[in-house]
């Protein structure tokens, strides 16, 4: 007689949940980072939409002069924004239950802090989810490393800068014109255009755009044609095909003759590493620059640095920039103080004779 023994499936509900969360067969990979990413990003997005449409004015400067940012309070898509949390709150953690009422929470700009903190946690988890999926598929981790650049930039403007300045009211408003206002005020107070890390960031972004356009145009111009002249060359590609889709030798020869031989990559892997690394490193430096300027380690100041033999100042473009900075700073928070802080710090001369 033969006995057949079946092992009972002892997998628990928790075990099935873990397998589902970490399965790479799902249409969208969730992962353990996704368990935190999904609710935080949904919260940030939902509150942003509601606040952008209907949030009441916020006392951003803490001087009882609220500024409206929502559509229902007179703004449009261009000038609307989520107004940063009030200077009266500073860096305090300000959830809804810390306010005496929801009206007070809205008046002090509570939605901004809620959105920003959930957003930063969400995008950090998205980066972790990229690493997690790469790990489970046996891929290298560089996708998450590249994504760390925009995560670092967002963290710098939404968290590190307010910490350095002592208040979430100094964070970047969540809107189009609010972003421009933040940039102008940042230039006025920190002279960011004269900071070397910002210069590296500009080189990274613009250089990355240039290299991306050059690479795309070279590849598109050196496709191996698999179709007739009457068909699109794109129809000659089949997803997953083993053959090369373009002639890298032809592209290398073209670019080497256009510039010089060693300006062109002859290794596809090192080429694509360069295309990824250039803008990523540039944005890393920009985020680092924002984080240092948050604590007032500002850009270079060459104000009145060129003088003639008689000691008279010979104005340079640096002096023009400094004059523009003062003008922008005067316009910033004009109701909170009458003069730029660096001018107001100078003791006024006596007028009593």
From Swiss-Prot:
State the compartments where it is located: Plastid, Chloroplast thylakoid membrane
Which gene produces this protein? psbA
Q: How is the cofactor bound?
A: The D1/D2 heterodimer binds P680, chlorophylls that are the primary electron donor of PSII, and subsequent electron acceptors. It shares a non-heme iron and each subunit binds pheophytin, quinone, additional chlorophylls, carotenoids and lipids. D1 provides most of the ligands for the Mn4-Ca-O5 cluster of the oxygen-evolving complex (OEC). There is also a Cl(-1) ion associated with D1 and D2, which is required for oxygen evolution. The PSII complex binds additional chlorophylls, carotenoids and specific lipids.
Organism of provenance: Medicago sativa (Alfalfa)
Keywords (alphabetical) are: Acetylation, Calcium, Chlorophyll, Chloroplast, Chromophore, Electron transport, Herbicide resistance, Iron, Magnesium, Manganese, Membrane, Metal-binding, Oxidoreductase, Phosphoprotein, Photosynthesis, Photosystem II, Plastid, Thylakoid, Transmembrane, Transmembrane helix, Transport
Q: Which CDD domains match?
A: Photosystem-II_D1
Official protein name in the record: Photosystem II protein D1
Q: Which residues form the propeptide?
A: 345-353
Q: Which residues bind chlorophyll a PD1?
A: 198
For the keyword Calcium, the answer is: yes
